[in-house]
A protein has these predicted regions:
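Short flanking/linker segments adjacent to small metal-binding domains or redox-active Cys/His motifs
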Residues: 81-120
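Short, charged surface segments at domain edges that flank catalytic/cofactor-binding sites
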Residues: 1-18, 93-97
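Histidine-centered nuclease catalytic patch
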Residues: 18-51
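Short microdomains enriched in Cys/His and/or Lys/Arg
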Residues: 39-51, 74-89
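Short Cys/His-centered divalent metal-binding micro-motifs
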Residues: 23, 27, 51-77
């Protein structure tokens, strides 16, 4: 549900998205949920700022195109917030089953709303 939310959130009303790393405009169906800080870091895994729509080429074949991803994040959020996000990766975090269940409910409801708004 979280991955779908990120892709829906970053989708434009016309059904296209702009890759955070390379800036290409592509159809929603070609969007991946790209993580700036690797998913193995649980403290940022579900951080909405850490996750953005990314084209499959950048996410899968360019190992996230991290240098350009960082530039895209700075343009979107500002350098200070990106530095704070980077600092979070060293924090240890473990989610409980209850927390996972709540995340699923929360993002399922948001996805329903966004799908309707975006006409997808």
């Amino acid at each position: 549900e979280f991955s779908l939310f990120i892709r829906l959130r970053d989708c434009m009303p016309n059904g296209y998205f702009k890759c955070i790393s390379c800036g290409q405009i592509k159809p929603f169906e070609q969007a991946d949920n790209g993580h700036y800080i690797n998913r193995q870091h649980m403290s940022t895994r579900f951080d909405e700022m850490n996750c953005n729509a990314q084209c499959r080429h950048c996410n899968r074949f360019m190992e996230g195109n991290i240098q350009n991803y960082r530039k895209g994040l700075i343009a979107k959020y500002g350098e200070q917030r990106v530095v704070l996000l980077e600092a979070k990766q060293g924090i240890s975090r473990k989610f409980t089953d209850f927390e996972y269940e709540q995340l699923i409910k929360y993002y399922k409801a948001l996805n329903k709303k966004l799908k309707k708004e975006r006409g997808l």
